[in-house]
Amino acid sequence: MADVYPVDPAFAADARVTREQYAALYRESIQHPEQFWGKAAQRLEWFKQPTQIKDVSYALDDFHIRWFGDGELNASVNCLDRQLATRGDKTALLFEPDSPDAASYPVTYRELYERVCKLGNALRNLGVKKGDRVTIYLPMIVDAAVAMLACARIGAVHSVVFGGFAANSIADRVIDCQSKLIITADEGLRGGKKIPLKANVDAALKIPGTNTVETVLVVRHTGGAVEMQAPRDRWFHDVVDGQPAACEPERMNAEDPLFILYTSGSTGKPKGVLHTTAGYLLFASYTHEVVFDLREDDIYWCTADVGWVTGHSYIVYGPLANGATAVMFEGVPNYPNVSRFWEVIDKHQVTIFYTAPTAIRALMRDGADPVKKTSRKSLRLLGSVGEPINPEAWRWYYEVVGDSRCPIVDTWWQTETGGILISPLAGAVDLKPGSATLPFFGVQPALVDAEGKILEGATEGNLVLLDSWPGQMRSVYGDHQRFIDTYFRTYPGSYFTGDGCRRDADGYYWITGRVDDVINVSGHRIGTAEVESALVSHPKVAEAAVVGFPHDVKGQGIYAYVTLIAGQTPSEDLHKELVSWVRKEIGPIASPDHLQWAPGLPKTRSGKIMRRILRKIAENAPDQLGDTSTLADPSVVDSLVNERLAR
């Protein structure tokens, strides 16, 4: 039996949702979804109130997902305009720079509103219209949030690209969504190092197919020298500063696109996950308020980057729609020292802290002292996101960071889901280290076997969701068939998450990790096919296979098996060259942790690579290879086992 940490009665006494309320609200949300979400829609401010709440069919011959379909609203109005009357002087975003020696500063709701309006006007003057796509490739600075909200204000669809991605990854995303304009910065700062953002954009725009980009706006952030190409490149401040501080918001239908965010799939090409305006915004704000038990005076800090969905939902859209104060942190957990997170918590008196298991595991390695030399007395709630948290890391987080007095909300969700789907509510649900516990309102998880049969009781299987929720993605941008095939064809009538899961006797859910060809590295999804195609594009590589393996800090690491073309011999230099080749093609997050030279790969007689075998070798479990008799050349396996890098 897993440890159980009961709800703290003092926390429950003041919580937004109690145990009894959770049970009643969850029941209503499943039995009467139109009634439940119709009431929840009153959280938002509408130009036109919706009368149609839910219109969903997962049937393959009549597939559609629509929420609040006749409603009209604007996301930026909900995040900014409606806060001005009562919260105009309240801090919306609290910027904390990469270096503690640089100045942190608050941005109020009124200041943020004016900055967004100025940029919205500038974008309109540059010819950006409703429905046009704008690529945002910025560091974790306030202008990243400004850019997202300015797009939302004028009805443009933003596509944020994580600042750690390289030129090819930027180009892929620009080409896929036919972006009209890019907003970037001269350079980013991360852990004291400069990231050449503008130079990466320049390199991306030399790649064929990117010529839809008419303008590049460049934020002067570090002041580093960059090449400016007239008339395409313009300094952000030159274009924005003189604009009026009011901007007429576009009236958006509830189902109009709000943003595209690319995520790795099990095939090589990243998927453009499309989220729409009303359902996404409602779900992000509702989950943010309830899961984090939000109060008016909270200082909330989510350490994610806006380049990922966690930054979209739980730094920008959720907190601002709720009138909260959110910390925006440019830095990393271990620069200039490993106390940085805890020093920032004390400096800004952070009350709610939301981070990834990878960061926790990395900081655990340095022991309790760097944590204990800070106070952290302001904290009242901790959260975890991005990957399953192992019980050891959960306990360390609870006991060392939270001094055994702050509940932990271990949240499970995905880019595709828009917001949190399974998580404890700290005033309502007892905690178990390593379990995401119970579903949020309107979320119906089920476990199925390989044939799609629903499994009851305490069991393990593939995690599916039986019905829709407002924050659900609506399509893969430009490829609706891929959306249906990826998520709804495997188990017809339900959404397939791609995750394995176990349910215990108390009905708690324990996510066990991906069951497809996607690796979760530090909470970031990397498609094995993406890394394989990057490796194979090197002139000396004949073939490559990539799998995940358990990693103490990152959760999963990347293990690559590489076969060279005839006449090439493995060397340390070539090893280094291939690792940096992947960094250049995709970005540092995709760098292989292990790269093993392979004389051949284990294949069936039909030529299919047996990844199951490669995974077991990478996991250092050569005794669990199973049946290898169907392989075209079983001797390949012996050689790979003998040369394995995982010991």
Swiss-Prot record:
Catalyzes the conversion of acetate into acetyl-CoA (AcCoA), an essential intermediate at the junction of anabolic and catabolic pathways. AcsA undergoes a two-step reaction. In the first half reaction, AcsA combines acetate with ATP to form acetyl-adenylate (AcAMP) intermediate. In the second half reaction, it can then transfer the acetyl group from AcAMP to the sulfhydryl group of CoA, forming the product AcCoA. Belongs to the ATP-dependent AMP-binding enzyme family. Its cofactor is Mg(2+). CDD domains: ACS (cd05966). This is Acetyl-coenzyme A synthetase. Pfam families: ACAS_N, AMP-binding, AMP-binding_C. NCBIfam families: Ac_CoA_lig_AcsA (TIGR02188), PRK00174.1 (NF001208). Mg(2+) binds at residues 536, 538, 541. It catalyses: acetate + ATP + CoA = acetyl-CoA + AMP + diphosphate. Its EC number is 6.2.1.1. One of its GO terms (molecular function) is ATP binding. The modification N6-acetyllysine is found at residue 608. The gene is acsA. Keywords: Acetylation, ATP-binding, Ligase, Magnesium, Metal-binding, Nucleotide-binding. It comes from Xanthomonas axonopodis pv. citri (strain 306). ATP binds at residues 386-388, 410-415, 499, 514, 525. PANTHER family: ACETYL-COENZYME A SYNTHETASE, ACETYL-COENZYME A SYNTHETASE 1. CoA binds at residues 190-193, 310, 334, 522, 583. It is an enzyme of class 6 (ligase). GO terms for cellular component: cytosol. Acetylated. Deacetylation by the SIR2-homolog deacetylase activates the enzyme. SUPFAM superfamilies: Acetyl-CoA synthetase-like.
